[in-house]
Amino acid sequence: MSLLQLSPLLALLLLLCSSVSETAADYENTWNFYYERPCCTGNDQGNNNYGKHGADHVREFNCGKLYYRTFHMNEDRDTLYVGAMDRVFRVNLQNISSSNCNRDVINLEPTRDDVVSCVSKGKSQIFDCKNHVRVIQSMDQGDRLYVCGTNAHNPKDYVIYANLTHLPRSEYVIGVGLGIAKCPYDPLDNSTAIYVENGNPGGLPGLYSGTNAEFTKADTVIFRTDLYNTSAKRLEYKFKRTLKYDSKWLDKPNFVGSFDIGEYVYFFFRETAVEYINCGKAVYSRIARVCKKDVGGKNLLAHNWATYLKARLNCSISGEFPFYFNEIQSVYQLPSDKSRFFATFTTSTNGLIGSAVCSFHINEIQAAFNGKFKEQSSSNSAWLPVLNSRVPEPRPGTCVNDTSNLPDTVLNFIRSHPLMDKAVNHEHNNPVYYKRDLVFTKLVVDKIRIDILNQEYIVYYVGTNLGRIYKIVQYYRNGESLSKLLDIFEVAPNEAIQVMEISQTRKSLYIGTDHRIKQIDLAMCNRRYDNCFRCVRDPYCGWDKEANTCRPYELDLLQDVANETSDICDSSVLKKKIVVTYGQSVHLGCFVKIPEVLKNEQVTWYHHSKDKGRYEIRYSPTKYIETTERGLVVVSVNEADGGRYDCHLGGSLLCSYNITVDAHRCTPPNKSNDYQKIYSDWCHEFEKYKTAMKSWEKKQAQCSTRQNFSSNQHPNEIFRKPNV
């Protein structure tokens, strides 16, 4: 039978073979070792094909799209206060799902007149002309709350009880009502505020804020409210603010955080870099500080800060030409550790997108503020450090008992020299973590101490603009800081994470987006990992090799966060035995879907055979094929392919298969799997025929171009006849 006569039969059989799924042809790969349980999205349970996914570690609070963008946590009261559109919610820290949208809330809607005025200025009635709560701070040991909202582009502040009820008229708080310079006009503007009860002039409490102080956004300000003696209902100290319309002090800043530490209040923000303006436009990240006892100058700077200083924050990849992440997006400080700040940075959105996490030590910050000042002698000159001999005494920016007694030379100097020369460098010469094509929005940090092992881990939870959380662990080995990505999980797909908080008492992470709030247990363990390899690298978890499960860490469990013991999980790796038919193609794999955190890791397959011993598999299109999930396809198995196949990630064993080849090629089939094996062999044979057919057709096409164009030439002639 010729190849041409066989082609209809080939076409039919090849069509049948191509309609068979890969899992039918490679029937052995219907079972895998690893899968990653879903984490935090609402439909996880319905889509989980690998066992029931308990949702007890993920809880949600949702009262509609209310722009949940402000958190204030009070662990003593087991409460998370949430600022939203026209509302403040009181959410149960233990279980946010138990909170009620109608009961645990106070409504703070703007008046009709405020809304009408807002709309008349061209603002949206359904978003802009609402009261978006942007500041919630505890007062009086948490008995009362200070609240400030945009109030239809007419900022307004309130003092309410911690149970979300209004104060009676008899408890009116003087100085409260007008929220200008305390929170923004525009709900989309970044701002920060912190209520400071100790260390201020006269020991009086007051709010420190960083925000826009005008509807037009022309006046940005770092501000402290008037300080009142509440018992006497008397103003003791007037407000203090940055110099108005002076780009050396502030130039279009975006504020991201503020902190009360010792004698100072620190502010973190990004702004247009005045020192770079002669070379073009750039945005730099800053840290600024003011003394809490600052009362301004006597004649100069009477209503302004007399101790205001700022310095650049440097988050960059080190090198001869460092790569800078110039735009700070968020900052966090552990309540138990005032010596460090952790922050997320991004590149400019106009160029190559990238994000990084950097940490800063208070000693490096103090060194920058104690260093040289920077100045520009004329509008066309470069910015240069100021000689120490030109710095007046007492040193500008130093906290003194009464700043109104500072000499004019000091006040004049600080008025024109608020910028420090030295940047604040991040720790360890490199970011904790960085990644391109990613926008980090918020972060929180946890610290885990295992005393018996004398080991400390810092765990970063970093939110993105697409609703994902990157979980990163940092640890020290021989004095060197090391960090690695542990996990990536989706919390709110395609929603930007707007705010985050973490509770040590409840061991929970809280995430806010415009649509919802979610609570996630820090120790997910068996609800996230089904295998030893992933489990032992999470500092919250440990592998129980007796029960073959992942549990919250205890001393008798396996754990290897630093990956120092590559074979720690070898005894826990499941090993599968497979019998395959001669000529069969078999698919071996460890993952149903490879976790994203492992996609860039090197996966290596090894074959242990009788003839060659142990050797590394080299991929080839005719024998060994790598799948998209790092699995291995062995094509057309023969006796030499028998033996053990091990899959390694780095030095760690992930999974193992022991293959036995059935050399009796004509064994009568006795079950459905045997029929599938034979059918797979036929498909393999017809693939060979298909290849031969294509080769024949190609040669036929080449021959047809050589045919004689004369009408009397025989179609089968291979030589051209000479013309007669």
UniProtKB/Swiss-Prot annotation:
Alphabetized, the UniProt keywords read:
Developmental protein, Differentiation, Disulfide bond, Glycoprotein, Immunoglobulin domain, Neurogenesis, Secreted, Signal
The keyword Lyase appears for this protein: no
Residue intervals of the Ig-like C2-type domain? 552-663
- Pfam families from the xrefs? Sema
| Residue ranges of coiled coil | none
SMART domains given in the database record:
IG (SM00409), Sema (SM00630)
Sema domain boundaries: 45-522
SUPFAM superfamilies tied to this protein? Immunoglobulin, Plexin repeat, Sema domain
What does the entry list under GO cellular component? Answer: cytosol; endomembrane system; extracellular region; plasma membrane
Its quaternary organisation is:
Interacts with PlexB.
Tell me which family the UniProt entry assigns to this protein. Belongs to the semaphorin family.
Q: What does this protein do?
A: Ligand for transmembrane receptor PlexB. Plays a role in growth cone guidance. Required for both proper adult behavior and survival. Can function as a selective target-derived signal that inhibits the formation of specific synaptic terminal arbors. Function in neurons is essential for adult survival, motor neuron survival, and is important for climbing behavior and activity. During embryogenesis, plays an important role in correct salivary gland positioning.
| Protein's UniProt name | Semaphorin-2A
Annotated organism of origin: Drosophila melanogaster (Fruit fly)
